Amino acid sequence: GQASTLPLWRVRGQVSYLDEGAVPELPFVLCREAYLTRAAGGIHSAGATYDLHDHDPQLRQSSHDENLSKVRSLLGDAGLVPDAPLRGRVGFRCVGPDRLPLVGALPDATPTGRAERLRDLPRHPGLYGLLGYASRGLIWAPLAAELLAAQLEGEPLPLERTLVEALDPARFMLGKARKHDIVTPGPPVETP
């Protein structure tokens, strides 16, 4: 497809579910090197692992233990009930080489010759993307959506031009195009 040449890959993440009472009641979400949510429906969520080059969709005890270790570091002496049973889910993040999201018109990877600026690179008409949030989707998604809406409607952009360019999906092609190399983006998204 038109996005298959973007330099994106998938990164495994495992979230652990802990029964209410397995950790002290929290008035808020804790977040540092990991996160721990308040109980919702009797369950706390804790996580998540960040497993590069790992396509295993199954829950693993080792990932669960990693999450529990991170929860212990968040809580300090407040405690965690030992031996929480293995429960949770596995998901896969979409990640780019610089870990910034890709927001805007998707580039056409057809060889183009020399290009000095992002706006000089060809795009697929009418094809836009909001992807590659890595583990920061909750932070980036609202701003990225506002940026894309402004681009689509021709409205003033909500960000400075340098940040808009840092998020442009064609940014990975620009260096090659400046050197007059054939424009070919990085490896496609890995699939299991």
Where do the model's predicted regions map?
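Active-site substrate-recognition segment that forms the wall
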Residues: 1-125, 187
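C-terminal catalytic lobe of FAD-dependent flavoproteins
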Residues: 77-192
